[in-house]
């Protein structure tokens, strides 16, 4: 596990973006952990979060021209990632986001920021059903651009309704990589090295054995 990944886990726990307990998901499953990027609610937390996103995409070595944030959670994540790429990695790239509703006055349209041109990096918090990604792919295609990759905070490595995860389905359907700062295995590895967490690790491993995808 890279330092930026363990630092991200610590940041997420500190801000209660990563919580442990019993959480009923939309799927009806009871999960021993839950991730919510909306808990990064301060300027310093968002700045650090952007640095971790930027580190993950840099480590992946993906070539892209524009950073795109899907409304709504993806908007601050894309902005923070673009800032970190410029400040920390010397890559001053344009960014863009969409509105949920088209604007019929002023600049109009559904897109705000830089034009969608070339290879597009999509930045979001998680992929659950993949619905948001499908919508974004349509926006990118309509603009005449190409998706380069999807960058998210956490890969739960969890089956959807079938044997594949939503992330694996996105990769298969659209032919683009989905890159995450961390995945479930990173969380388990981190907790295994923390005192007094053996019972929690066992619960997470049991959940993974039931719902985890084959990697």
From Swiss-Prot:
5-phospho-alpha-D-ribose 1-diphosphate binds at residues 26, 72-73, 99-100, 103, 105, 124-132. PROSITE patterns: PUR_PYR_PR_TRANSFER (PS00103). Pathway: Pyrimidine metabolism; UMP biosynthesis via de novo pathway; UMP from orotate: step 1/2. GO terms for biological process: 'de novo' pyrimidine nucleobase biosynthetic process; 'de novo' UMP biosynthetic process; pyrimidine ribonucleoside biosynthetic process. The keyword Transferase applies. Belongs to the purine/pyrimidine phosphoribosyltransferase family. PyrE subfamily. This is Orotate phosphoribosyltransferase. It comes from Cellvibrio japonicus (strain Ueda107) (Pseudomonas fluorescens subsp. cellulosa). The gene is pyrE.
